[in-house]
Amino acid sequence: MLTKYALAAVIVLCLTVLGFTLLVGDSLCEFTVKERNIEFKAVLAYEPKK
């Protein structure tokens, strides 16, 4: 029963991330979260289409 809910949670999380990426994909190059003394930074490295 718990595995069923865990699988559903993972699927919802993946769909949320995919949807967010599709919505802001053109402007998503850097994502930064700062909280107190912790900083999380994700940078997207890619080459634009020619």
UniProtKB/Swiss-Prot annotation:
InterPro entries the UniProt entry points to: Hok/gef_toxin, Hok/gef_toxin_CS
What Pfam families does this protein's entry cite?
HOK_GEF
Q: What induces it?
A: Repressed by LexA, induced by DNA damage.
Entry's Gene Ontology cellular component terms = plasma membrane
- Name a biological process GO annotation: DNA damage response
Would you say which domain of life the source belongs to? Answer: Bacteria
Keywords per UniProt: Cell inner membrane, Cell membrane, Membrane, Toxin-antitoxin system, Transmembrane, Transmembrane helix
Its function, per the record, reads: Toxic component of a type I toxin-antitoxin (TA) system; if it expressed it could be neutralized by antisense antitoxin RNA SokE.
Further remarks about this protein from its record: Interrupted by an IS186 element, which silences the locus in strain K12 MG1655.
User: What is the protein name stated in its UniProt record?
Assistant: Toxic protein HokE
Q: What is the native source organism of this protein?
A: Escherichia coli (strain K12)
